[in-house]
């Protein structure tokens, strides 16, 4: 190595270290166009032009729904992380650890309490990035806790569903969450409070046989895949070709399974109107929307601050 290499090498090394971030560009699954990630993020993860709705994380979803992007992060009960000591190709405990590192969440469901255009509401969001949004003990406990809080606060409960189904690594303990959440929804109904479901892409498996299809009002995002079994499984079983768009939000709306297909940019005002209608609350004046709550009503602190539920 001569003296020239000694001079040039550090610069070359610094150039090699300049790596392009993996998520700098996003390819639209619908149109194939490349879009700058920050533009998609600023557009609530809707691809400009094609209007394709990308998957949205739980925190980003809550920010897009609540007034001033603030809410209570509801503290959730601890559950056994790996009750069956399950192992397939990898240990289930390791899969949980990786999912937590990837998403920053403890499990697949995040619950927040705040205001939507000045109307108090409890919102639960499934994050598909956490093991496919699968329903396990922790996710079931989060939904039940959110429903209990809605009854306590006399507020509507909104569920954003996104899941591949029950979490098989937890066996019967996972399947048990289907009747548990159903019973909790019934308690909400007995309290005279609305239950609104937003079906996002994808919502499949066991969740569609329980809480995801029990809403007083069923909304869906455009193009969302919604169904119990996969299309290929159904075709192989019935030995027939399925109709165009089968199991998509628009098809389900045409056949009465979904009440409304709502663009993500219209989701917040739509939910606010539904909450006011079902709770029989008058619409606020324009200057009151996203304004601080009255002194006698406790408003939501910043999202990072958790709040513990009182004992039952």
From Swiss-Prot:
What is the first-listed, main subcellular location in coarse terms?
Answer: cytoplasm
Pathway field of the UniProt record reads: Lipid metabolism; malonyl-CoA biosynthesis; malonyl-CoA from acetyl-CoA: step 1/1
Task: Name its cellular compartments.
Answer: Cytoplasm
Q: Which UniProt keywords apply?
A: ATP-binding, Cytoplasm, Fatty acid biosynthesis, Fatty acid metabolism, Lipid biosynthesis, Lipid metabolism, Nucleotide-binding, Transferase
Asked if the record carries the keyword Heme, the reply is: no
Q: Which InterPro entries match?
A: AcCoA_carboxyl_beta, Acetyl_CoA_COase_Trfase_b_su, ClpP/crotonase-like_dom_sf, COA_CT_N
Assembly: Acetyl-CoA carboxylase is a heterohexamer composed of biotin carboxyl carrier protein (AccB), biotin carboxylase (AccC) and two subunits each of ACCase subunit alpha (AccA) and ACCase subunit beta (AccD).
Q: Which family does it belong to?
A: Belongs to the AccD/PCCB family.
- Please report the name of this protein according to its UniProt entry: Acetyl-coenzyme A carboxylase carboxyl transferase subunit beta
Q: Which organism is it from?
A: Afipia carboxidovorans (strain ATCC 49405 / DSM 1227 / KCTC 32145 / OM5)
